Amino acid sequence: MQSADNLIWIDLEMTGLDVDSCKIIEIAAIITDKDLNIIAEAEPIAIYQPDEVLANMNEWCIKTHTETGLTQRVKDSKISTEAAEQQILEFIRKFVPYQSSPLCGNSIWQDRRFLAKYMPNIDEYCHYRMLDVTTLKLLNQYWGDGKSFEKKNTHKALDDIRESIAELKFYRQELLSI
């Protein structure tokens, strides 16, 4: 059921961080209510990229995406960037009205840049505002009492979103008296 109070969480895995030369290879999405309760999850989608794109990944991406199995899932995938965008957009539309939710996640500006370039319909559907958990992480480092959120950093899109939601819950408890 659609609600303007629902939040759109997206995570991308890419072949690198340069939006002009790198590509999206995985996308996942979760919808939560404003209290961060998960309403629905979209299965992560591995996006096909040709071998020449994968060959241009940096050392970190090659190691990480090979260890998680993502590189092989990308090679085996039949799903284009456009098809993945359409699937995720259809998922979001079930739960969130047009431009009512900020885009939520960790260091979400990086994901937003890739969405704007490669999945502009998702980018446009989200409100221009962003809820970036990284901001609270930094504030906690500066002003917190030393407690920190321990991340697993699996670099799997759906796991990363779940972890971002849990991290925001942690900071809400530790930093915010609202």
UniProtKB/Swiss-Prot annotation:
Q: Which GO terms describe its molecular function?
A: 3'-5'-RNA exonuclease activity; nucleic acid binding
Biological process (GO), any one? DNA metabolic process
Q: Which InterPro entries match?
A: Exonuclease_RNaseT/DNA_pol3 (IPR013520), Oligoribonuclease (IPR022894), RNaseH-like_sf (IPR012337), RNaseH_sf (IPR036397)
Q: Top enzyme class of this protein?
A: hydrolase
Q: Which Gene3D superfamilies match?
A: Ribonuclease H-like superfamily/Ribonuclease H
- SUPFAM superfamilies assigned to the protein according to its UniProt record, in alphabetical order: Ribonuclease H-like
Q: Cellular component per GO?
A: cytoplasm
Question: Catalytic site residues?
Answer: Y128
Keywords for the protein's UniProt record, in alphabetical order: Cytoplasm, Exonuclease, Hydrolase, Nuclease
Its primary localisation, in coarse terms, equals: cytoplasm
NCBIfam families this protein is in? PRK05359.1
Family, per the entry?
A: Belongs to the oligoribonuclease family.
Under which name does UniProt file this protein? Oligoribonuclease
Source organism per UniProt:
Francisella tularensis subsp. holarctica (strain OSU18)
